Amino acid sequence: MQIKAEEISQIIEQQIQHYESRVEMSETGTVLSVGDQIARVYGVQNAMAMELLEFPGGVMGLVLNLEEDNVGVALLGEDTHIKEGDPVKRTGKIFSVPVGDAVTGRVIDPLGNPIDGLGPVEAKETRNVEIKAPGIIARKSVHEPMYTGLKAVDAMTPIGRGQRELIIGDRQTGKTAVCIDAILAQKGQGVFCFYVAIGQKKSTVALVAETLRRHGAMEYTTIISATASEPASLQFMSAYSGCTMAEYHRDNGRAALIIYDDLSKQAVSYRQMSLLLRRPPGREAYPGDVFYLHSRLLERAAKLSDALGAGSLTALPIIETQAGDVSAYIPTNVISITDGQVYLEPNLFNAGIRPAINVGLSVSRVGGAAQVKAMKQVAGTLRLDLAQYRELAAFAQFGSDLDKATQLKLSRGMRMVELLKQPQYKPMNVAEQVISLFAGTRGFMDDVPVEAVRKFEEGLQEYFHNAKSDILNEIQEKKALDEGLIAKLGAAIDEFKKGFKA
C-alpha cells in the first residue's frame, strides 16, 4: 500500500481546519507545610470555605481555615506523598455527594465512593453536604409514629417521624443494637434508612452490614462508613454526607431515618482537626463551635409541611458516655439539641434487662403526639407504675411487712420488667406490642410465675398469629381499643391461659 503525497497534504489540511486551541485556566497555590492530615497552602486567593482542592496524586483537600496569607486544608486522604512546595489546584467545587435511589443498599465512604465491591454508584444528582436546615414555616409538628419495634421505647419514650431522639449510654450497653432494631422495624414501612458509622472498627461495620443483609434490611438502607483508620476530616464530614443523602428523600415527600453512630467520635475528630489548624481550644479542649457542629446537623432532621411534600427525616444520634457521666460537655450539648433521650445503663444490661433502658431518665419531648391511641390506652400509666415499683422494691429489701396493695404492685412490677425484655433483632409491630402490654398492664399475667413471663408472651403472640389474627388486624386498622375490642382481647387471653403450662 502506497500513500500518495496529495493524500498526506489533504489529511494535514483537514487537521488544520479542525484544530481547536484549548487553554485551561486554574488557580494554583503552593504547599507551605503538611503533616497530620493538615496542609497550609499559599496562593489560592479566591478559595471558598468547604471547597475541594486537588493535591498531587489526586488527593483531595477540604478548605477549613481562610487566613490572610494562607488557607488551612484538611486532607481527605493520605499525606505521605505530599511535600512542601508541591502545586495545589482549585477545583471550584464545594464538597458534595451523590444522592438518590442509586445509593440505597450500598456501603459507601463520605465522598460517595462505593466500598462494598458492587461497582460504581450511578447517581443522577449530587448535593452539597452543608445545607441550611428548614425554617419554622417549612416545618410541621411531629404527629406520625416512627416505630422502633422495641416495647420499652414505643410504649414509654415514643418516637415520631421528624424527631431527634438521642440514644445515650456507656460503651457496651446496646446502643447500636437499639438502632439496628429500629432499622429492621422499618421493613415494609416505606422508610429509607441511613446508618453513619463514625470512627468504628471495620469489623463492627462489616457485622452491621451483614446483620442488615441477613434480615433483608439492606434493600432500603445505606451505610456511610468512616472507620477509625480514616483521616479525621472524613470522620468529621461523614455525618453531613449521610444527612445530605437522607435529606433527598425528605425533600421528595418520603420518610427517612438516619443513625449517627456515634457523635462523640465525630466531636473528637473535629477537636483533633481544630487543634491542628490552631483554632483556640475551649472546655475539654473542644473548639468553641462544637455545639454548632452538632446543632446544624441535627436541626436538618424535620417533618416538612404539606406544602413542601410532608416528607420527614428522623435522627437517632448516639452518644457514648464515660462511666455514666451524662453531665460532660458533649452529652449535655446533644441532650439540649435533641427532642428527648433513651438512656441505657450498664447495671441494667449486666442484670439481664435488655434493652437496658433506664425508664426514669429516658424521655421523649414530642413523641407523645405521635403515639397511636391503642398504645396510649395500654401503656399510659406504665412509666409511673414502673417508677413506683422501683421505689417500693428499694423499701422491700428491708423485709418489712407489706400490705396487699404494695405486694400486688411489687409482683406486677416484676412481671412488667420481665415483659419489657426483648431479644435482639426481633422487633415487634404495634399490634403485637399492644397485645403483650395489654396482658401485662391489665393483670392477666399476675398469676404467671416471673420466670415464665417470656414464655407466656411468646406463646400468646403465637396464639394470636395462628388463631386470632383477625384481632391483630383490627388493632392495626383501628389503632385504638374500643369496648368491643377490649372484651375480645380479654376473652382471647383468658382462653390462651387455660391451655398455658408454665
Swiss-Prot record:
Disulfide bond entries: none
Stretches of the chain forming a coiled coil according to its record: none
Assembly with partners or alone: F-type ATPases have 2 components, CF(1) - the catalytic core - and CF(0) - the membrane proton channel. CF(1) has five subunits: alpha(3), beta(3), gamma(1), delta(1), epsilon(1). CF(0) has three main subunits: a(1), b(2) and c(9-12). The alpha and beta chains form an alternating ring which encloses part of the gamma chain. CF(1) is attached to CF(0) by a central stalk formed by the gamma and epsilon chains, while a peripheral stalk is formed by the delta and b chains.
One Pfam family linked to the record: ATP-synt_ab
Record function comment: Produces ATP from ADP in the presence of a proton gradient across the membrane. The alpha chain is a regulatory subunit.
Annotated binding of ATP, by residue: G169, D170, R171, Q172, T173, G174, K175, T176
Organism, as annotated: Solidesulfovibrio magneticus (strain ATCC 700980 / DSM 13731 / RS-1)
Site, Required for activity: residue positions: S362
Highest taxon in the source lineage: Bacteria
Keyword field contains Nucleotidyltransferase: no
Cell location: Cell inner membrane
Topology of the protein relative to the lipid bilayer: Peripheral membrane protein
Keywords tagged on the record: ATP synthesis, ATP-binding, Cell inner membrane, Cell membrane, CF(1), Hydrogen ion transport, Ion transport, Membrane, Nucleotide-binding, Translocase, Transport
Catalytic activity: ATP + H2O + 4 H(+)(in) = ADP + phosphate + 5 H(+)(out)
Gene name of this polypeptide: atpA
Record-level Gene Ontology MF annotations: ADP binding; ATP binding; proton-transporting ATP synthase activity, rotational mechanism
Family designation: Belongs to the ATPase alpha/beta chains family.
Cellular component terms (Gene Ontology): plasma membrane; proton-transporting ATP synthase complex
This protein's name: ATP synthase subunit alpha
SUPFAM superfamilies per record: C-terminal domain of alpha and beta subunits of F1 ATP synthase (SSF47917), N-terminal domain of alpha and beta subunits of F1 ATP synthase (SSF50615), P-loop containing nucleoside triphosphate hydrolases (SSF52540)
InterPro entries: ATP_synth_asu-like_sf, ATP_synth_asu_C, ATP_synth_asu_C_sf, ATP_synth_F1_a_nt-bd_dom, ATP_synth_F1_asu, ATPase_a/bsu_AS, ATPase_F1/V1/A1_a/bsu_N, ATPase_F1/V1/A1_a/bsu_N_sf
PANTHER family: ATP SYNTHASE SUBUNIT ALPHA, MITOCHONDRIAL
The enzyme's E.C. designation: 7.1.2.2
